[in-house]
A protein has these predicted regions:
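A conserved hydrophobic secondary-structure block that centers on an alpha-helix together
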Residues: 51-114
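Noncatalytic luminal/extracellular "stalk/propeptide" segments of secretory-pathway proteins
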Residues: 1-70
């Protein structure tokens, strides 16, 4: 049997950091939620399109494949370029929103000892 989606599924994103008892700053309720300075705010409901690192060449590749981000939410990994460029390119290609996430394979312990 296959799942049939007949209406959009709304998923609120929790931007609060998880509490780590080893880090006292994560227990401070006064700390703000994460944000990307100088970007717009709003409530967006749209299809999500994965755009790798959100670099210009990633958007060009999507375009060459016939995939448009116009009116959609772009999902991009941190790294590869400055996060401000991810927003700039997403806006230039007509995206309605942008979510930037950390890929565990690109950071932290997966990279090995420093």
């Amino acid at each position: 049997a296959y799942a049939e989606v007949v209406e959009p599924v709304r998923i609120p994103l929790n931007n609060k950091e998880y509490i780590h008892h080893e880090d006292p700053f994560t227990t401070n309720p006064e700390l703000p939620i994460g944000f990307n300075a100088y970007t717009g705010s709003g409530d967006v409901t749209a299809e999500v399109v994965y755009a790798n690192y959100g670099r210009r060449e990633d958007f060009q590749k999507l375009e060459a494949m016939g995939i448009s981000v116009k009116g959609k939410i772009v999902l991009a990994r941190y790294g590869g370029n400055f996060r401000g460029y991810k927003a700039k390119y997403a806006q230039a290609y007509g995206a309605a929103g942008l979510i930037i996430f950390t890929d565990p394979g690109d950071s932290g312990y997966a990279k090995g000892l420093v």
